[in-house]
Amino acid sequence: MAKLTKRMRVIRDKVDATKQYDITEAIALLKELATAKFVESVDVAVNLGIDARKSDQNVRGATVLPHGTGRSVRVAVFTQGANAEAAKAAGAELVGMEDLAEQIKKGEMNFDVVIASPDAMRVVGQLGQISGPRGLMPNPKVGTVTPNVAEAVKNAKAGQVRYRNDKNGIIHTTIGKVDFDADKLKENLEALLVALKKAKPSQAKGMYIKKVSLSTTMGAGVAIDQSGLSAAAN
């Protein structure tokens, strides 16, 4: 059996795995236990009442968090003409068509998000085996294939998070950094839950948001009492 580190022992002693914490108490606990030598992210796991084996119950989308994620995001855009100028003006680091595709084929992928206008998908489609496994393939379901590339760039820069349930019906994403004010983390979490509720599949029955847990990059999960969140997020 692996030996517990001092940090792991502290977390084990502080976090009650059987308890649902009020959101304010949970955030204070996460901040107390975030002792890594870097600013840890605050991540959320949301257990959904869906059958992930059925394609019509899968949940996928994107939403802009009111206070962003605390990450600087580099954006690449496949488009041309006036859209290319608009993308650059909106802050995209890389804009192009075949030239950008050639960079990616060479392994030059210094970006976090890829956006494409519909007319560029003939070029982007060639990159599926490279971009797909890295989660960088543009998709209309999360707003990264769109005629309005400038708005998509602004959303990405403003702290948009993309979400997709895993095979167990759980959504994993980030809602900010541990040095965010508690109110900002709470509001970001509520915004995500509102977006997930709007994305509820009509075929999903029973309780939809079954469990919400927060953790930091290096910390343990803390279950959240949802009654302490805004009415819209419940």
Swiss-Prot record:
<dbReference type="GO" id="GO:0000049">
    <property type="term" value="F:tRNA binding"/>
</dbReference>
<dbReference type="GO" id="GO:0006412">
    <property type="term" value="P:translation"/>
</dbReference>
<dbReference type="InterPro" id="IPR002143">
    <property type="entry name" value="Ribosomal_uL1"/>
</dbReference>
<dbReference type="InterPro" id="IPR016095">
    <property type="entry name" value="Ribosomal_uL1_3-a/b-sand"/>
</dbReference>
<dbReference type="GO" id="GO:0006417">
    <property type="term" value="P:regulation of translation"/>
</dbReference>
<dbReference type="GO" id="GO:0019843">
    <property type="term" value="F:rRNA binding"/>
</dbReference>
<dbReference type="Pfam" id="PF00687">
    <property type="entry name" value="Ribosomal_L1"/>
</dbReference>
<dbReference type="GO" id="GO:0003735">
    <property type="term" value="F:structural constituent of ribosome"/>
</dbReference>
<dbReference type="InterPro" id="IPR023674">
    <property type="entry name" value="Ribosomal_uL1-like"/>
</dbReference>
<comment type="similarity">
    <text>Belongs to the universal ribosomal protein uL1 family.</text>
</comment>
<keyword id="KW-0694">RNA-binding</keyword>
<keyword id="KW-0678">Repressor</keyword>
<keyword id="KW-0687">Ribonucleoprotein</keyword>
<protein>
    <recommendedName>
        <fullName>Large ribosomal subunit protein uL1</fullName>
    </recommendedName>
</protein>
<dbReference type="InterPro" id="IPR005878">
    <property type="entry name" value="Ribosom_uL1_bac-type"/>
</dbReference>
<dbReference type="GO" id="GO:0022625">
    <property type="term" value="C:cytosolic large ribosomal subunit"/>
</dbReference>
<dbReference type="InterPro" id="IPR028364">
    <property type="entry name" value="Ribosomal_uL1/biogenesis"/>
</dbReference>
<keyword id="KW-0820">tRNA-binding</keyword>
<comment type="function">
    <text>Binds directly to 23S rRNA. The L1 stalk is quite mobile in the ribosome, and is involved in E site tRNA release.</text>
</comment>
<keyword id="KW-0810">Translation regulation</keyword>
<keyword id="KW-0689">Ribosomal protein</keyword>
<comment type="function">
    <text>Protein L1 is also a translational repressor protein, it controls the translation of the L11 operon by binding to its mRNA.</text>
</comment>
<comment type="subunit">
    <text>Part of the 50S ribosomal subunit.</text>
</comment>
<keyword id="KW-0699">rRNA-binding</keyword>
<dbReference type="InterPro" id="IPR023673">
    <property type="entry name" value="Ribosomal_uL1_CS"/>
</dbReference>
